[in-house]
């Protein structure tokens, strides 16, 4: 274990010593369903990395429930049993946030079978493409100004206040836009996992931040060169699956010259995703409670735990 600034740092073997014996039974078939397009995760990852992480979240969740009870007793109020414990997961495009979110949802659902554990992404709170075009910022999609932060914060406030069943806008990577009339239903979860590149950011014009609603936060980290490789691999898979569907956003690239398509993807990575990572996403890393660092093959080789 290393101690650096405000984090304890553990390599893979060291971290696995923390309650990996509480390995939750997960099958290869379940992992295959959880994986994002070109992500990689194994049963070894579940045992060595995610089982100890699940146990840490269990401890934080128990503490949270105790804090809520203490506050309710101080105020002389009955505690709302549906005030959720919210976990935020941040990191670059293509780094594997969605896989982490889905796996944690599975593990926590197994740990708390009587609880409602849900997962959502902030992609649905991007402005629709038509609105981005109207504002002249379609080429900055994914940057802070491309999100309807007021709507997202209003949504998070309603979730935290257990305001009943709520509808989150739905985003589709196939059409590269918000899906009109379709929503994800978030219905009074006990635990909610919120995944998105922007969840730890501090927008300058907001009096309250998305992260203010989090009770635990995770940043998925990797070398930008590796993330670019994963981004391009994912782009190739999207091309392979889009060429038969004219309604798919990637169809136009799938039926054209593949070299030209990848040249475009590299430019998007350089001008949009890498710039967004360096300027707005990476600076939020040290706000997370846990940093999961990935290396070749999406293997997590280091876990950093915030000291305070």
UniProtKB/Swiss-Prot annotation:
Molecular function terms from GO: ATP binding; pantothenate kinase activity
Subcellular location, record wording: Cytoplasm
Catalytic activity as recorded in UniProt: (R)-pantothenate + ATP = (R)-4'-phosphopantothenate + ADP + H(+)
Highest taxon above the source species: Bacteria
HAMAP family, per the entry: Pantothen_kinase_1 (MF_00215)
E.C. numbers: 2.7.1.33
Pathway field: Cofactor biosynthesis; coenzyme A biosynthesis; CoA from (R)-pantothenate: step 1/5
Hydrolase listed as a keyword: no
Source species: Lacticaseibacillus paracasei (strain ATCC 334 / BCRC 17002 / CCUG 31169 / CIP 107868 / KCTC 3260 / NRRL B-441) (Lactobacillus paracasei)
A Gene Ontology cellular-component term: cytoplasm
Name the UniProt record assigns to this protein: Pantothenate kinase
Gene Ontology biological process: coenzyme A biosynthetic process
Similarity remark: Belongs to the prokaryotic pantothenate kinase family.
Annotated ATP binding sites: 91-98
Keywords: ATP-binding, Coenzyme A biosynthesis, Cytoplasm, Kinase, Nucleotide-binding, Transferase
Residues in coiled coil: none
InterPro entries: P-loop_NTPase, PanK, PRK/URK
């Amino acid at each position: 274990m290393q101690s650096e600034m405000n984090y304890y740092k553990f390599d893979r073997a060291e971290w696995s010593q923390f309650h990996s014996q509480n390995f939750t039974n997960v099958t290869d078939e379940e992992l295959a369903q959880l994986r994002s397009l070109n992500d990689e995760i194994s049963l070894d990852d579940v045992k060595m990395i995610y089982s100890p992480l699940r146990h840490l979240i269990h401890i934080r969740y128990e503490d949270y429930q105790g804090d809520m009870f203490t506050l309710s007793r101080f105020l002389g109020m009955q505690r709302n049993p549906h005030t959720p414990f919210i976990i935020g997961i941040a990191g670059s495009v293509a780094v594997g946030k969605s896989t982490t979110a889905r796996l944690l949802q599975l593990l926590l659902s197994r740990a708390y079978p009587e609880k409602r554990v849900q997962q959502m992404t902030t992609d649905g709170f991007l402005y629709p493409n038509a609105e981005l075009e109207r504002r002249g910022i379609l080429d900055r999609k994914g940057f802070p100004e491309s999100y309807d932060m007021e709507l997202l914060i209003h949504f998070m406030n309603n979730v935290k206040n257990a305001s009943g069943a709520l509808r989150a806008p739905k985003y589709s990577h196939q059409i590269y836009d918000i899906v009109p009339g379709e929503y994800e239903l978030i219905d009074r979860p006990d635990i909610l996992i919120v995944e998105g590149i922007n969840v730890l950011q501090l927008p300058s014009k907001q009096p309250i931040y998305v992260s203010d609603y989090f009770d635990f936060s995770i940043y998925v980290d990797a070398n930008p060169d590796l993330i670019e490789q994963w981004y391009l691999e994912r782009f190739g898979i999207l091309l392979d699956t889009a060429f038969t569907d004219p309604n798919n956003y990637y169809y136009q690239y799938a039926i054209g010259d593949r070299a030209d398509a990848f040249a475009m993807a590299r430019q998007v990575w350089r001008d949009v995703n890498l710039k967004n990572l360096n300027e707005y996403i990476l600076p939020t890393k040290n706000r997370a409670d846990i940093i999961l660092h990935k290396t070749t093959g999406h293997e997590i080789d280091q876990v950093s735990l915030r000291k305070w």
